[in-house]
Structure formats: structure tokens, C-alpha cells
Curated annotation (Swiss-Prot):
UniProt source species: Haloferax volcanii (strain ATCC 29605 / DSM 3757 / JCM 8879 / NBRC 14742 / NCIMB 2012 / VKM B-1768 / DS2) (Halobacterium volcanii)
A GO CC term assigned to this protein in UniProt: cytoplasm
Single GO MF descriptor: inorganic diphosphate phosphatase activity
Keyword Lipid metabolism: no
Protein name: Inorganic pyrophosphatase
Temperature dependence: Optimum temperature is 42 degrees Celsius. Is moderately thermostable, with a half-life of thermal inactivation of 2 hours at 65 degrees Celsius, and retains 82% activity after incubation for 2 hours at 42 degrees Celsius.
Biotech / industrial applications: Inorganic pyrophosphatases are used in a wide variety of biotechnology applications based on the ability of these enzymes to drive reactions forward and generate an easily assayed product. Since HvPPA displays robust activity under high-salt conditions and in organic solvents, it could be a valuable tool for use in bioindustry.
Lineage: Archaea, Methanobacteriati, Methanobacteriota, Stenosarchaea group, Halobacteria
Statement: the UniProt record of this protein carries the keyword Methyltransferase: no
Annotated SUPFAM superfamilies: Inorganic pyrophosphatase
Keywords carried by this UniProt record: Cytoplasm, Hydrolase, Magnesium, Metal-binding
Activity control, per UniProt: Inhibited by sodium fluoride (NaF) in vitro, similarly to other class A type inorganic pyrophosphatases.
């Protein structure tokens, strides 16, 4: 069986175009995680707060970030896909975040194969309402989990997202190549 984290490339033209492996689905409370040892997607938990993922959420293959996990990516989609789905996407922004004292930033991306997102090239192209909903979700989704503390730290542009992806690719190479 293919290991979606280790066996797939980061993207067809990373960091400009990446692959996003979906774990969690838009509109749902289930927190799935890819378990590379199985390999497969497993239910990690159901979110304790009454919130749902604002869009499909997962990771970028062959990346490793400062939180010692594959680099997180939220892909703006109209309709949810499914856990394990691979979306070819373009990074357009970076959300800075601290999760229990660890840097846990999120790449925001759009699907290459959805013309509804062709006009979104950078942070300034994302509607403010969408950014507010994403920020609200990540700022509050762990509120009812004992001992968990999350702080969103603002937004950065496409270049910052691409730089962070390159950093995560380098960390993967240093730790796993």
C-alpha cells in the first residue's frame, strides 16, 4: 500500500503547486489523521467544541514542520471530498498559529482543477469573511479540550506560504531522507 506521506512527491511543481492529502472534511467535526504506520486514515477524535472544519484539511506529502508533523494545509473547496483524497493545489496564504506552545502554521491553498478559485492568487484575493471563519475555527476548535491552548497569530501572503513549504521540505529531507 502507498504511504501518502512518504511515497508521494510534495507536488508537481512545489512549492508553486502542491499535493494536499485530505484528512478532515469541510462541514464535519471528525478529526481524522493519516497514520503512516498502517498506512491509512484513522479517526483521531471528534472535536469537543460545536464547530466544524471550514474546508477540507490535511497535509502536504514529504514535508515536516516545526510541530514535528507533516505540514498542515487547508484547501478551499465548495464541496467536501473524502479522507485520503489527493488535491492538486496552489498555496495562496499562510495562517500563523501557536498550538500548546508549538508553532503550528497552516498553508491555505486552492484547487488547481476548480475554476471558481482561478481568481484567488494571494492573501488579498481571499474574501475577508472566509479568512475570519478560518481564524475563528482554529482559534476555538480546542476550547472544550482540557489543557489545550491555541492562539492564531495572523495572516501572511503567498510568498510566505511558499517559503514555509520549502522550509518543511528541507526539514523532511534532513529528518527522513
Amino acid at each position: 500500500m502507498v504511504n501518502l506521506w512518504e511515497d508521494m512527491e510534495t507536488g508537481p511543481n512545489a512549492p508553486d503547486e502542491i499535493y494536499a492529502v485530505v484528512e478532515c472534511l469541510k462541514g464535519e467535526r471528525n478529526k481524522y489523521e493519516y497514520d503512516k504506520d498502517i498506512p491509512g486514515v484513522v479517526l483521531d477524535r471528534v472535536l469537543h467544541s460545536n464547530v466544524h472544519y471550514p474546508s477540507d484539511y490535511g497535509f502536504i506529502p514529504q514535508t515536516y514542520y516545526d510541530d514535528e508533523d507533516p505540514f498542515d494545509v487547508l484547501v478551499l473547496v465548495e464541496d467536501q471530498t473524502f479522507p485520503g483524497c489527493v488535491i492538486e493545489a496552489r498555496p495562496v496564504a499562510l495562517m500563523k498559529m501557536d498550538d500548546d506552545g508549538e508553532q503550528d502554521d497552516k498553508v491555505i491553498a486552492v484547487p488547481v482543477e476548480d475554476p471558481r478559485y482561478d481568481h484567488i492568487e494571494d492573501l488579498d484575493d481571499i474574501p475577508q469573511q472566509t479568512l475570519d471563519e478560518i481564524d475563528e475555527f482554529f482559534a476555538t476548535y480546542k476550547n472544550l479540550e482540557a489543557g489545550k491552548e491555541v492562539e492564531t497569530l495572523g495572516w501572511e501572503d503567498k510568498q510566505a506560504a511558499k517559503d514555509a513549504i520549502e522550509h518543511a521540505m528541507d526539514l523532511y529531507e534532513e529528518n527522513f531522507a
